[in-house]
């Protein structure tokens, strides 16, 4: 678990949620540096959450952010399982419907930004609704 200094000078451990939020901010900044535009963060729909929604040109990009300290057990990208992909697809489907769209009418893709140790990996179009 990550630590941050406090006003008293002694480090305080971050919760899992705080650590995840911090890496999502890093991913957002990194993607913005690559030219993507921010749309939303931590989008919750029935049964799931999408970490980031970005735009690249006319494409809506649903982003899953993952962090692992090391690649000992496969690294961050390997942690996006088929079950997680299914939840992300369902959540995106609901979000699109709420915004008067669907996979048939909106150009979209699913990316993974994986932080493993000090390395960042951007997997564009990591999976889709036909996977």
Swiss-Prot record:
Which CDD domains does the UniProt record give?
A: PoNe_Nuclease (cd20736)
Give the residue ranges for region: Disordered.
1-20
* InterPro entries the record matches: Restrct_endonuc-II-like, tRNA_endonuc-like_dom_sf, UPF0102_YraN-like
Q: Which Pfam families match?
A: UPF0102
A GO molecular function held by the record:
nucleic acid binding
List where Polar residues composition bias occurs. Answer: 1-19
The record's SUPFAM superfamilies line, in alphabetical order, gives: Restriction endonuclease-like (SSF52980)
Q: Which family does the record claim for this protein?
A: Belongs to the UPF0102 family.
Kindly provide the name given to this protein in its UniProt entry: UPF0102 protein YraN
* The organism of origin for this protein: Escherichia coli (strain 55989 / EAEC)
Gene coding for it = yraN
């Amino acid at each position: 678990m990550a630590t941050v200094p406090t006003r008293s000078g002694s480090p305080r451990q971050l919760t899992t949620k705080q650590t995840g939020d911090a890496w999502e901010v890093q991913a957002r900044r990194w993607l913005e540096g690559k030219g993507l535009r921010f749309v939303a963060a931590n989008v919750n729909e029935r049964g799931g959450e999408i970490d980031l929604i970005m735009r690249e040109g006319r494409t809506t990009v649903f982003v899953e952010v993952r962090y692992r300290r090391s690649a000992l057990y496969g690294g961050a990208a390997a942690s996006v399982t088929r079950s997680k992909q299914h939840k992300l697809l369902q959540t995106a489907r609901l979000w699109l419907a709420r915004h008067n769209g669907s996979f048939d009418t909106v150009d979209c893709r699913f990316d993974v930004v994986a932080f493993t140790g000090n390395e960042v990996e951007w997997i564009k179009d990591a999976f889709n609704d036909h996977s």
